[in-house]
Structure formats: structure tokens, C-alpha cells
């Protein structure tokens, strides 16, 4: 009878331990595309601003006036078959060039656990772009997932200072 007073504490403690899950969600659960500058223009001395248009029609700046960059990461949409990005390059003299980059991709839902947030992985199918300030863009790694160690796209900017 004297042990019955510990029953509520024991029930709460058992409930606490039984509610814990052995599945851990990944800490790095953001799917980002890694861009690496290649060629003669690394790092890029000009200010680089990258924006996109959201599904509701408003603009969103993804990278704001980055200077002396040689790589950067950008988020990937999960509800559109292609991402349209606007690369604006501006130097200290004031001239500005804007290139449009279209990344065609295929989205795949990725399931870890019921406890984890949903995520999408992607396969880059094709990249097209205007050629005002960008010379070329090469697909280096087509699978976009949690692993952001290797560059997915290599960007070759034109050199205007030669």
C-alpha cells in the first residue's frame, strides 16, 4: 500500500520514456543548390544580386549585393518544374547587367520519418541563360539533396576588365 503513492510518478516517467523516438531527423534539412564560380572571374569583384519571382508574382531577393564571392547557395522551389533566377551584376562605375537563368528540374518527395519535416530532392535536367554577363553554366552534379559539399552548377562569368 505504501508503494501506491509512487504509482503516478512511475506512470509519468514511463510515459516520458516511451514517447521518445529513436529516429533522428537530419540537422541539415534544407535542400540548397550550390553555385561555384569557375573560369577567369573567380572571385567576382562586382556586386552580385540574385532574385526570383514568387508564385504570387512578387519578387524575392535570394542573394543581395554579394561582393568577392566565389560560391553561394540558393534554395530550390519544390512546386514548380523550373526555377527562373535573375543574376544582376553591378560594378563600382555604375553599369549593370542582368542575366536570366532558367533551371529545369524534376522534384522528388523525400520521406525520413513521420516526426521530420517533409522535404523534396531534385534532379537538374537542363540550364539555359542569357549571355550578357554570363558566359556559360555547366551542370556539375545533377542530384540536389541534403549534401551541399560539391557544387551543383559551375558559373562562368565574362571578364570585362581585360
Tell me the role of every PLM-derived stretch:
Residues 21-77:
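Start-of-domain marker
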Residues 1-7:
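Bacterial N-terminal signal peptides that target proteins for export
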Residues 16-19:
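C-terminal motif of bacterial Sec signal peptides marking the signal peptidase cleavage site
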Residues 21-27, 71, 75-162:
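Extracytoplasmic cysteine-anchoring/structural motifs
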Residues 5, 65-67, 131:
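Generic detector of solvent-exposed, compositionally biased contiguous segments
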Residues 11-14:
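Alpha-helical transmembrane segments
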